[in-house]
Amino acid sequence: MLEACKISYSHKKVSILENIDVTVNYGELLVIVGPNGAGKSTLLSMLANEMKHNDEPIIFKKKTFEDWDQKELPLHKAKFSQQNSSDIPLTVMDVVMMGRYPYFNSIPHQSDIDAVLKSMAETDVVAFKDRDYNTLSGGERQRVHLARVLTQLENDVAHKLVFMDEPLNNLDVLHQHRILHTVKNFTERGNTAVIVLHDLNLAAQFADSVLLMQKGKIVNHDKPEKVFTKEIISKVYNFPCTICLNPVNQNPLIIFGT
């Protein structure tokens, strides 16, 4: 699905990423974790082909991003970013409809409206679809933009790819789990998701694989139970922790400060 080799990036002579190799498979939910400044968001932007890097090409569905038709690519790939404008003079539904722009010229089709309503239901924003976007709280705006990204990929294309940079910021526990269940359902249909998260326990619960970063390098990339060990996590985060099994789902449960 996605292959990247020897990704390196520097800014003003400061190394941000160093020789990163990543392969993501069809139907996989990969979660990128690591301390602040590890390079998580930069790596995500690189993988999404939003930033220039060294000459090594990134392969998506056996083609480089440069070889893709730029009108076709948005039907296969979408990205949710951390920074979204706080001043958008549109209704909530109009903001979500922006995700359908690759599908129509000036007037949305009924299929576009249906896709928007479906994504809004998944992110629990239907109730304020006619409200001014600027009147929403931070968490509500976050869910609106998640709906916008999801509706972009609402189509019959096989093996789609979504990138999400800290999609759970400002969300309460209910909506954190609701969003991750939606993403998990997306990958269970043969699609792929690459997500940056800070909550290690949510990563352990939902991820098929975890990529742990520190200072621009990969520390470990494996199944959650292989990455989330006391030795690895305590060292990378420079903070003591205990790892036990979650009694409900048997995933690793990280308890910091112990």
Question: Which residues does each PLM region occupy?
Answer:
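The feature captures the beta-strand-to-loop junction immediately N-terminal to the Walker
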Residues: 33-35
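ABC ATPase nucleotide-binding domains
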Residues: 230, 236-258
